[in-house]
Amino acid sequence: KHQFRREAVRMAQQFDYPKTETELRKLQDKLYQHSKKVYDEGGRPALKGLLEIMSAEATIITAIHNIKSNHGSETPGVDSKTMRDYLQHSHSWVIRDIQSAFKHFEPQKIRRVYIDKPGKAEKRPLGIPTIRDRIVQECMRIVLEPIFEAQFFAHSYGFRPMRDAPMALERAKLLVHHTGYHWIVEGDISKCFDRIDHAILLKRLYHMGIRDRRVLQIIKAMLKTGVMDECEVNEEGTPQGGLISPLLANVYLDIMDEWITKQWEIKKTEYPFSKPYRKYKGLRRTALIPGFLVRYADDFIIITDTRAHAEDWKKRLQIFLHSKMKLTLSPEKTLTTDIRKKYIKFLGYEYKVVPGKARKGYIPRTIPERDRLRRKTDKIAHDIKKIPHYYSREQMVDAINRINSQIRGIIQYYQCCTWVNISMKKYSRRLQFVARRRLTQYKGKWIPANQTQNLPRVHQQYKQKIPSMKYRDIYIGFTVLSFCKWEKTIPKKEEETPYTEAGRQLFFERTKKKRIHARLDEMYSEKSARATRYGQWGKLNNFEFIMNRAYALNRDKLKCRVCGGWLISSMPWAHRVNPNLPLNKVNRVNNLISLHKKCLDAVNNPNYGISEFDAKAQKKIIGYREKLVPSHTRNK
């Protein structure tokens, strides 16, 4: 252990702070690989010098971009500021402000709001930090996540990258199928996030490799942050709403994961086994109690072989949580269930096994959780009825698209259920008739789905009639809840992670989604960067412009949008297509294009001769010139 610790500290001291997003991503990979190597060899990493990485300019820009992409970025904290306020400051001011926050971190109080809990009278408290504190938290998450991802239990799925709820359900089904165990402990921790002990959490962070005491002090200050109009100091819990809170909750619950899995699933044996099933076969000859864990945030199940063992797990877990983590199991919601006789509820799904042609004699049956599905369809029916009667046909088309998005969202979440189509049919007809009545004033009709013009990928597969309205000689229809089929979930591969090249390739093979390219800040000259950082080109060249011009260059694939030539040999220039837009829109990526200097001059100067350009480029130049009217603004 001492050898691992010395090696880890030396490794940490070799890390240089990143100067670009490309370097930041490489550094994340290094942090993951180092932590994984030490962990797999039986130790724990011991990393220092993390604050310099968190407060680096490249990390701050990435953090702001991540937050800006979420709808919550326009939700103000106690200081009434939103992300828009930061984006409109100069680049240098934003960087200095966040770096200053890291050096002298004093978090502002949290603004508390309460949201409805589905199907419950009580409300869920959400703590909203200020934008400044959110940026600091996101900078920390970017650096800490790869360190913890290398050490987390392989089958915890909540709040982790490249993982989702269907994977957790699929893991449970596979365990039952392979082991033949049918007794489930349905775990429910009472107010888990509100009762996390700060001292235990900080010790766990230190244990998992965070040896930079400055970082631990900042996290401690975050945890202790008071709530406006409620308390000066928060003595326990992580604020639900903080960007780093889900990661910290996983760190805390990893204590439970480690305790459960070391008793059976990853128990060390005197002699190594070449295959896991041989190890479990040997363990079954001992007095140990079998148990396999699947966890998603604070929802978890333990799969075991008999009722007595299930009750034993429940009893011992209650003692462990109380004594080691200061948490308690909810006695009403923590159940032991034989899934051959009764459904369990897990992550919004219901799961049991029924007799069938399988090696162990049972096959899985999964359905959407009935109460939750009913509430969701009730809400959609209510939303359809509430569509204003004064809506024009254009507005009604937008309303139909919004409702269809809600319906397809429900289908997407539940299509991993084997009986999804049967379950959806029970609620589908009601929504159809509600939708048809709402279209009466637009002379709505029942039209075959494959004859409507919206959602073609879905509707072209079905001839069933759906409520539709005519709009400009085409039919737009409300989609149907039963337009769904079971889709098998691909089991999670432990090697799939955002922090290795092989892991990213596995993610692409599973989802066909490519990783977004890193910002190309290094493509802009240092002279240009200095001028824009210190606001020498006016208020339009604010932080948002500096950040988004690099993302626009990515979108343009390093090619000039006028002549199509490569922008590698010379510095690219960012041009605002419409410089007359308001400040909150003028620097968005969709209003920025990348050009050669010569092409930029041709666009901005109406007297510039364009005969040297080919016909296609000339047409583009003329088009961009027209959008500059009434002002010709030179943008760099």
Q: Which residues does each predicted region cover?
A:
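Conserved polymerase palm-domain catalytic core
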Residues: V94, K109, A154-H155, R160-R163, ...
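Active-site and adjacent loop segments of nucleotide-processing enzymes
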Residues: K1-K19, E23-K30, H34-K36, R307, ...
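Non-catalytic, polymerase-adjacent accessory regions of viral genome-replication enzymes
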Residues: K1-S92
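Reverse-transcriptase-like RNA-dependent polymerase core
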Residues: I67, D97-A121, I131, I135-V143, ...
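Duplex nucleic acid-engaging cores and interfaces of nucleic-acid transaction enzymes
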Residues: L126-R141, E149-F152, S156, A165-P166, ...
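Histidine-centered nuclease catalytic patch
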Residues: D188, G564-K597, N607-Y608
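Short beta-strand-to-loop capping motifs
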Residues: D85-Y86, T130, I302-T306
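Polybasic, low-complexity binding patches
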Residues: L567, L583-N590, D601-K636
